[in-house]
Design a protein with these regions (language model features):
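Phosphate-binding beta-alpha-beta segment of Rossmann-like dinucleotide-binding domains, i.e.
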Residues: 84, 92-129
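An N-terminal-biased, well-structured beta-alpha scaffold segment characteristic
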Residues: 1-89
Length: 129
């Protein structure tokens, strides 16, 4: 299976797909406007934040699956893909640990009034209380 990854992904994801016998092309510099140029013969497209619009989908001659490597599919024209018989899926929940870490970090920042301290420091105030 020919796979195009149009955004940055961890190298282990690429090697894992290659070990399964897939032909993987990595092109993280590809923009939404030029994406259609790289889709010739591609069966699976993997994106993170690159937009996949109806015009791009209509030019994909062998595309069968679009994978959004993240939560949501808001960067993909799902209706256009469906009308072409192309499946669209996402990978929700992979960022759950990072979200939990951020939440606890923000709770600590609120509890310790870090933002208030930063504002004071920028104004030249050193309040030791």
């Amino acid at each position: 299976m020919k796979i195009l990854i149009a955004d940055k992904v961890h190298p282990s994801a690429i090697s894992g797909l290659e070990n399964l016998g897939h032909e993987v092309t990595l092109n993280p510099a590809c923009t939404s406007n030029e994406l259609h140029k790289y889709l010739t013969g591609v069966e699976v497209l993997v994106v993170r934040s690159t937009r996949v619009v109806a015009e791009t989908i209509s030019k994909a001659n062998s595309l069968e699956l679009i994978i959004r490597a993240g939560a949501g599919t808001d960067t993909i024209d799902v209706e256009a893909a469906s009308s072409q018989g192309i499946y669209v899926c996402n990978i929700p929940g992979k960022n759950a640990v990072a979200v939990a870490e951020l939440t606890f970090g923000l709770l600590l920042a609120i509890d310790r009034r870090i933002a208030d301290g930063v504002i004071d420091l920028r104004e030249g105030i050193w309040n030791k209380k």
